[in-house]
Amino acid sequence: MTLRPLTVLMPFHTPFYAPLAAGAALGHFREEGLDVRWQAAAAFGKSTVQALLDGSIEISLGGLMRSFDLADRGERCLPHFAEVCSRSGFFLLARAPMPGFRWSDLVGKTVIGFAEAPTPWQCMLTVLRRNGVDPTTVRIERERPVAEALAAFRAGQGDFFEQTQPIVEQMLASGEAHLVASMGEATGPVPFTSYMTTPEFLRDEPETVLRFTRALYRTQRWLAGHDAKAIAGAIAPGFPDIEPGILERAVGRFSRQDTWSRDPILRRAGFDYLQEILRTGGFIRKTHRYEDLVDMSIAERAVREVEARP
């Protein structure tokens, strides 16, 4: 069988995107006739959106907020066809243990945030407001890329640090920081990451998208049925720079809070919640229709077909 090659980008290199790494490692894509090669956008040399728009790639992981942003500016639509992460994968760290942490503890403090994407910041604003904290009373610094943000926190700048894995587990293990909150738990279920493509690819190659989504759903079912040790072992070849114990703990923390979607269906309720987060945070100004940014027709078929298999 001749495999259909696909290069799939992830916004940044992290085990947060384990469903992609696991799908490739377990052979689920190959069994659907796809030769999927994945890499981080930085290594590819283009952002996920840029690579899709200029035709360099056909499928990418990305936040739905990317398409909200494009639509809000009246630009070309990038539809999302399968949900991957149903919670934020970010965590809030402090310099010292804070067993009685309250969100009001951030008032007057500086949070060194994540600069590479706006969704973690927008979710933070929502969590603050929900807990009675005026976001203007908290200084959220989002100017530094990850390496510089990490160096700044280690150098004593800022009071809190918001980051994802593996940095979270690495800092907890070294004693440099202490976990005070999971943003995934604090924000609640939200379609944080999904697969996006172009309208033309959905129209011209629906069978390729179907095979890809069937592989995703098979991987999602596998992830739901295995423990952190098994998942970390499966994806380890894709993350050779992460020490095995750190990777297993990172996967375990993601898994315990149901970070990864159990199926590829991006539901309207999640879409509406994310839109509310982005509107109240000032990231978008208009209200957008679910049908304009999301196409679940192939995902729904993929679920039916996988579940019908013996």
Regions from the PLM with identified roles:
Residues 148-240:
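Pocket-lining segment of extracytoplasmic ligand-binding domains
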Residues 204-285:
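Secondary-structure end/capping motifs
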Residues 2-133, 140-143, 159-165, 176, ...:
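Short, glycine-/small- and polar/acidic-enriched structural segments
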Residues 278-310:
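Conserved C-terminal helix/tail region of periplasmic/extracytoplasmic solute-binding proteins
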Residues 57, 154-155, 254-268, 301-309:
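Short amphipathic alpha-helical segments at helix boundaries and their inter-helical linkers
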